[in-house]
Design a protein with these regions (language model features):
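PLP-dependent aminotransferase class I/II
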Residues: 42-46, 51-57, 130, 134, ...
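PLP-dependent aminotransferase-like
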Residues: 76-150, 154-166, 170-175, 182
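Structural detector of well-ordered beta-strand residues that form the stable sheet scaffold
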Residues: 95, 116, 171-172, 196, ...
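Conserved active-site segment immediately N-terminal to the catalytic lysine
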Residues: 173-207, 236-241
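Phosphate-binding glycine-rich loop
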Residues: 37-93, 107, 117-119, 186
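N-terminal "arm"/small-domain region of PLP-dependent enzymes with the aminotransferase-like
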Residues: 1-34, 401
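Glycine-/small-residue-rich active-site loops that bind phosphorylated ligands and cofactors
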Residues: 17, 100, 123-124, 152, ...
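Active-site PLP attachment segment
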Residues: 190-228, 251-256
Length: 423
């Protein structure tokens, strides 16, 4: 069968609009509530808190803003108020998911902390509890863990929380990618001490931008709300007694989120159907899909991902910004598949490049299940060496077109394109 390029691009994940969004945006404009207060903001804060299962929600300009204020709050709770012109994490280490987008990590740097990256495990591709326990052995004074749920798949939360509780550490939950996912029947975004979600344009629910901080503490919610409005004091004039930020969500962005929220379950179901069609369509190929804990979790299936078996990988070499490969019959690699998808006007993406491999963070500590991942032979490394799980998944994996508006017929063509790479 001859495959022709798609006339209309098949996206990785683009917004899925329904029309309700326009209603609430128009209302904001018609009533002149277009700034950072209004009925849309009030509504989405109530709706998200109810959906996720927390008492309070604070609407913010983006998920990164939520993560920043969550990290700042955790730092103040553990270490107290910082000195003037210093972050709350000055001189402190924070354990952080390694295979993630850098928005998970950057807020640690905003607060002058040092991220210690924790390797992934193969069951969910998330933070490895074994590596986390190793990290506490090596950095026993660390008291904050930044945990992300990769591609909408919940991490092994109970194991991670038990380790954190043992060491007196707080969890900042980065649920930016996992709104609608559940772990043991609880929504992600409600599991940590401080919780954050994102409404970026590619997320399962979007406001074009936007994010939210979630908590069961009114005191914490009030603190984050104050910080997000430039830390204005309750005074007759503009009074500021601590550093603040312009992190507020606009009532227009909130209108888009408000129109999206009734469709959360529908979006999750569509994403799951995409995942299942890929899984069925790849039968017989030397590949696996991004895994999850079937017994304890239900992902939101935000992005469907593919992992090529080790013995089915052709030669692939990656530099800082480019990649080369040599095609071999019966074998392929992420670079070849992504190039072929692009040729047919479909968008894929490499797996998140692990943070310990990023140029900006190459001097930060990195801990694997065997110990220090920066030193391949020392007292912390077992005799069989150090396995870098995240680097391996990055080398052999890719994100597939996962757009809700992709039809089953279009997805079947995507599957055929990928199958052809193994010929």
């Amino acid at each position: 069968m001859e495959i022709k390029p798609f006339e209309k691009k098949i996206w990785l994940a683009s917004p899925t609009m329904h029309g309700d969004e326009q209603k609430w945006v128009d209302e904001a404009i018609q009533t002149n509530w277009v700034s950072t207060v209004g009925a849309n903001i009030n509504s989405v804060e109530e709706d998200i808190a109810k959906t996720v299962g927390t008492k309070y929600a604070v609407a913010l300009s983006c998920g990164t803003a939520a993560l920043h204020l969550a990290v700042k709050l955790a730092g103040e709770r553990i270490y107290g108020m910082p000195k003037p012109n210093e972050g709350t994490l000055k001189g402190k280490t924070i354990f952080c998911t390694d295979m993630t987008f850098d928005a998970t990590v950057n807020p640690i740097a905003y607060e002058d902390g040092e991220a210690v990256f924790i390797d992934s495990e193969r069951d969910t591709w998330n933070m490895d509890p074994v590596a986390l326990e190793r990290a506490f052995d090596m950095y026993p004074d660390t008291k904050i863990v930044m945990l992300a749920h990769l591609y909408g798949t919940p991490a092994k939360f109970d194991e991670i929380k038990a380790i954190c509780d043992k060491h007196g550490a707080l969890i900042v939950e980065d649920a930016a990618e996992s709104l609608g996912a559940t772990y043991k029947s609880k929504q992600t975004g409600s599991l940590g001490d401080y919780n954050c979600i994102s409404f970026n344009g590619n997320k399962i629910i979007t406001g074009s931008s936007g994010g939210m901080f979630l908590t069961n503490s009114k005191e914490d919610a009030d603190k984050v709300r104050k910080w997000s409005t430039q830390s204005r004091e309750d005074a007759a004039w503009y009074q500021h007694e601590e550093i603040g930020y312009n992190y507020r969500m606009s009532n227009i962005v909130a209108g888009v989120v408000r129109g999206q929220m009734p469709y959360l379950s529908e979006h999750v179901s569509a994403k799951k159907a995409i995942y299942e069609r890929y899984k069925e369509g790849f039968k017989g190929l030397p590949v696996t899909m991004n895994p999850y804990d079937v017994a304890n979790s239900e992902p939101n299936f935000w992005l469907s991902c593919l992992l090529i078996n080790e013995d089915a990988m052709c030669k692939q070499v990656r530099g800082e910004k480019d990649a080369l490969y040599i095609h071999e019959q019966g074998k392929t690699c992420p670079t070849e598949i992504l190039e072929k998808l692009a040729k047919y006007n479909a968008e894929g993406r490499p797996i998140w490049k692990p943070m310990h491999m990023q140029p900006i963070y190459r001097t930060n500590p990195f801990i694997t299940a065997q110990g220090n991942g920066r030193a391949r032979s020392n007292a912390y490394i077992a005799e069989n060496g150090c396995e870098d799980v995240g680097a391996d998944i990055f080398q052999r994996g890719l994100c597939l077109p996962s757009d809700n508006k992709m039809t089953a017929e279009e997805q079947e063509i995507i599957i055929q394109i990928i199958r052809s790479c193994f010929e």
